[in-house]
Amino acid sequence: EEAIPRKNEAQTKKALGVEHWIGDEPWHESLVRLGSQPTINIEGLVGGYTGPGGKTILPHKALAKIDIRLVPDMTAKETVELVKLHLQKKGYGDIEVNMSGGYDPTETPADSKLVQAMVATYRKAGIDPLVWPRLAGSWPGSTFTGAPLKLPAGIFGLGHGAGAHAPDEYWLVESANPKVAGMDGSARSFVDLFFALG
């Protein structure tokens, strides 16, 4: 919640190319929901005849590929079963549901040594970071935060994320922006992080 007042709604709308949030939801509620609620997205749909010309036939098969972003207290396996149960309750028990990949949700407390070292490293570089409890995206952090390791894990980097996936999405060889490190500065930031961890 403390990061919300520092995030600019107008800049975010411009970057995302949107004029309003889902259901005209207020900005604050949208950000809280982004970090605390699961999502289900349709990645693609295929059905019926898609070749050249036309065919007056009923499709015998349809395919939907979805992704579900999980939050704490959910598991990938349980979520797949809940999707199957929902479809069955709605009369679509004949739909086959397969999980082709995925992982459980992950979370590391903001007061953990790792997150505090990341914040200290950003501040050393002159950046006052926003610390979000979760990302809208997904990454296999549960590999580290879940059993058997149960280690803190997070995403860090002074590289150029370009709003895509991560702060080290790709590196600039040299950067003219003081808030975005070039390749050498990005590499040094990880050294600084290791020293901050002690």
Where are these regions (language model features)?
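A glycine-rich phosphate-binding loop feature that marks nucleotide/adenosyl-phosphate handling sites
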Residues: 1-4, 101-102, 135-143
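Midchain, well-structured core segments that form catalytic/ion-binding scaffolds
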Residues: 1-74
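Zn-dependent metallopeptidase/amidohydrolase metal-coordination segment
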Residues: 36-38, 42-45, 54-62, 116, ...
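Short secondary-structure junctions
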Residues: 38-39, 90-94, 122-128
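A short beta-alpha structural unit
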Residues: 67-72, 96-111, 134-136
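Residues at alpha-helix caps and immediate loop-helix transition turns in enzyme cores, especially N-
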Residues: 75-79, 110, 114, 167
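Short amphipathic alpha-helices in soluble, non-transmembrane regions
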Residues: 79-88
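Short, low-order "capping/linker" segments at domain edges
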Residues: 106-124
